[in-house]
């Protein structure tokens, strides 16, 4: 390919970029499983190591709405989480899909340059985010911390960000299973859910000593209260701490999403180059997986962050108030939207709150379902999964839809794929709303991300590890 290209700009940086060397031969499944475990262990350790030099990490968290989705843990080395990787990946996917950068993924040099450019951008994002976090006072006033401590904090965050990038690359290049992004997000969510279910810590907020974990609290209340009926009601519906109803709702959503993963349309296809039995091309209900809810969550979370920062700086400005006004709730330091655009796209914190403000609830449902459907249909166009792209792949591989002419594949796919993408995106959005209204142990977005990721790992293990029959098939057959 002749001429100058944007990707050529990264060539001078290639020798200086940290890199995981690809394996010379395919790594055995057991070894990949081991490296996945090692990667996960490193992530968990980094999530618990506090940043050295911070003065304080108390008070309202402007990134509260993004923490679980980005596998971020405040005040630790995993402060940035997977944010640099996700942001860089989405930007370059968009640039590639819209043809703003030219790259031939079948060409190894192009592919390597594209990955290097994406990695370089992720590192630059880590530097930028770390600098902004420190200078905006997330760990204390910069003037009080001093230049040396501020620089040390930035270096810690950037170093941790580079480690996460390399851990993700380690898995992506075949040493482990799946990707670091999915693994870290699912682990972070599962850790939070497990803690809220079984935490042995106690708190006293006016009703005596209570256990934080829903299951532990259930047994404690049944054992310590004489009125067992009242104890059960308290364990299932207490509002100030995780309860059993939330845990059951979380398990129900997990099973429901696994069941819905089995919904698909299977198109019979055959090869024009050789004779043989028909194959099947599956088009799933969740055609774009969890991408719609990730994009919707990223959009609303960024609105929350911008609105909250503007409100703290200019609380009386009319335009800032239109975007959103914020206030704390009783017993919590975290700020929540109380009016403006941010209020109407903020999920209700309980089913009772949803009933008390039906207009806000209706607007929120329309926003989530509509945005997920739009993001899903848009994503297939920029990610190479549109009807035209799939029809092109069929042609290149010598495949046709059984019972149709070679030239009719695009028309048949156009009838199915956009509908599946839009309906699947709206379904993901509806499940997220259901999670938020039912008060699952974690936001709707984070629960869906973890379930789809865990199921993806199950399918990968079933395919590469030689496991037996799909759980979805048996679950669907049982129902």
Swiss-Prot record:
- Protein biosynthesis among keywords: no
Q: Name one GO molecular function term.
A: protein-transporting ATPase activity
The residue ranges for the Lumenal side of the membrane come to: 55-76, 141-146, 268-361, 435-440
Q: Which GO terms describe its biological process?
A: misfolded protein transport; post-translational protein targeting to membrane, translocation; retrograde protein transport, ER to cytosol; SRP-dependent cotranslational protein targeting to membrane, translocation
Q: Which parts of the sequence lie on the Cytoplasmic side of the lipid bilayer?
A: 1-33, 98-119, 168-246, 383-415, 459-479
Q: Which Pfam families match?
A: Plug_translocon, SecY
Membrane-topology annotation of the record: Multi-pass membrane protein
Localization per Swiss-Prot or TrEMBL: Endoplasmic reticulum membrane
Q: Which GO terms describe its cellular component?
A: fungal-type vacuole; Sec61 translocon complex
Q: Can you tell which superkingdom this protein's organism belongs to?
A: Eukaryota
Q: What's in the keyword line of the UniProt record?
A: Endoplasmic reticulum, Membrane, Protein transport, Translocation, Transmembrane, Transmembrane helix, Transport
What residues form the membrane-spanning segments?
A: 34-54, 77-97, 120-140, 147-167, 247-267, 362-382, 416-434, 441-458
According to the record's subunit comment, the protein's assembly and interactions are: Heterotrimeric complex composed of SEC61-alpha, SEC61-beta and SEC61-gamma.
Q: What the protein does?
A: Appears to play a crucial role in the insertion of secretory and membrane polypeptides into the ER. It is required for assembly of membrane and secretory proteins and is essential for cell growth. It interacts with other membrane proteins required for protein translocation. Upon binding to SEC62/63 complex, secretory precursor polypeptides may engage SEC61 to begin membrane penetration event. A cycle of assembly and disassembly of SEC62/63 from SEC61 may govern the activity of the translocase.
NCBIfam families tied to this protein? 3a0501s007 (TIGR00967), PRK08568.1-5 (NF006341)
Family, per the entry? Belongs to the SecY/SEC61-alpha family.
Protein known as: Protein transport protein SEC61 subunit alpha
Encoding gene per record? SEC61
């Amino acid at each position: 390919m002749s001429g100058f290209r944007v990707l050529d700009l990264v060539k001078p940086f290639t020798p200086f970029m940290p890199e995981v060397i690809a394996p010379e031969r395919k790594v055995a499944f057991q070894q990949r499983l081991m490296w996945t475990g090692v990667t996960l262990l490193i992530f968990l350790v980094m999530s618990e190591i506090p940043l050295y030099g911070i003065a304080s990490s108390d008070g309202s968290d402007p990134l509260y709405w993004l923490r679980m989705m980005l596998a971020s843990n405040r005040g630790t080395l995993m402060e940035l989480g997977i944010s640099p990787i996700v942001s860089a990946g989405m930007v370059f996917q968009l640039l590639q899909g819209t043809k703003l950068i030219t790259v031939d993924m079948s060409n190894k040099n192009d592919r390597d340059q594209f990955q290097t450019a994406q990695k370089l951008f992720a590192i630059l994002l880590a530097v930028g985010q770390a600098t902004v976090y420190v200078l905006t006072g997330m760990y204390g006033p910069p003037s009080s911390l001093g230049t040396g401590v501020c620089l040390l904090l930035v270096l810690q965050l950037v170093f941790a960000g580079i480690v996460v990038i390399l851990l993700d690359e380690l898995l992506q290049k075949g040493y482990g299973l799946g990707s670091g992004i999915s693994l870290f997000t699912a682990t972070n969510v599962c850790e939070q859910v497990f803690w809220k279910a079984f935490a042995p810590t106690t708190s006293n907020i006016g009703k005596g000593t209570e256990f934080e974990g829903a299951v532990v609290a259930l047994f404690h209340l049944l054992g310590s209260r004489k009125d067992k009926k009242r104890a059960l009601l308290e364990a299932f519906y207490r509002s100030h701490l995780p309860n059993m109803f939330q845990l059951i709702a979380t398990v129900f959503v997990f099973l429901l999403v696994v069941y819905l993963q089995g919904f698909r349309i299977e198109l019979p296809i055959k090869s024009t180059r050789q004779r043989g039995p028909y194959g099947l091309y599956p088009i799933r209900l969740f055609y774009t997986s969890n991408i719609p809810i990730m994009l919707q969550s990223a959009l609303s979370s960024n609105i929350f962050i911008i609105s909250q920062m503007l409100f703290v700086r200019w609380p009386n400005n009319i335009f800032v108030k239109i975007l959103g006004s914020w206030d704390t709730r009783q017993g919590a330091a975290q700020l929540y939207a109380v009016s403006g655009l941010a209020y109407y796209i903020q999920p209700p914190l309980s089913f009772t709150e949803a009933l008390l403000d039906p207009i806000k609830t209706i607007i929120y449902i329309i926003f989530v379902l509509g945005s997920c459907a739009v993001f899903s249909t848009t994503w297939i166009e920029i990610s190479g999964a549109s009807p035209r792209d799939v029809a092109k792949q069929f042609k290149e591989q010598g495949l046709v839809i059984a019972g149709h002419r070679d030239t009719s594949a695009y028309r048949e796919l156009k009838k199915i794929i956009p509908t599946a993408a839009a309906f699947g995106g709206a379904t993901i959005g509806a499940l997220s709303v259901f999670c938020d209204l039912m008060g699952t142990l974690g936001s709707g977005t984070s629960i869906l991300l973890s379930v789809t990721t865990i199921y993806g790992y199950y399918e990968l293990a079933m395919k590469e590890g030689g496991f037996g029959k799909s759980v979805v098939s048996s679950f669907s057959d049982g129902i």
